[in-house]
Amino acid sequence: LEISGWSEVEPVFLMGNHEQMMLRFLAEPEREARWLRVGGLQTLMSYGVSAASERGPEALAAAREALAEALGPHLDFVEATRFAHLSGNVLCVHAAADPALGPEDQDVGVLLWGHPDFLARPRADGLWVVHGHTVVEEPTIAGGRIAVDTGAYYSGRLTAVRLAPGEAPRFLTTLGG
């Protein structure tokens, strides 16, 4: 994977629940075959791996081997992603953070899958959590949360937010498909 054009900042890449499921599938294909039903088949096809239409142990093992080979250096990239990134009073995560806990006390499962209080209870500690996972029609800022998941997988609109000291957050959204 090659990224160019970054002159001011070093990019940080976060792990999401689907990446975690893929890594678990690669480790234990029979136990983690559920991944195939939630984007795994599409991932296999995107890497040129025939979809595992059979769910038997041999088919799953073959899919696992083919995917591991097809991923090549992308596997190292995914394994090196972070669960969270903290910069000042901004915590970037895939899904959520428990509003009752500080950034250093968060559970990885919450960071990747969410927390029941995350959208219902505003943060009271001054921390802002930038997150995806929960699709919003438009990017939003509320309750110590900055939501940027505009449903790219179905809307074609991918959103990011630029946060700079002394400036208002600036959303960048593709036009979609």
Q: Can you say where each PLM-predicted feature lies in the sequence?
A:
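Acidic, His/Gly-enriched loop-helix segments that form or flank divalent-metal centers
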Residues: 38-147, 151-157, 163-176
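Core catalytic region of metal-dependent phosphoesterases/phosphodiesterases
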Residues: 1-37
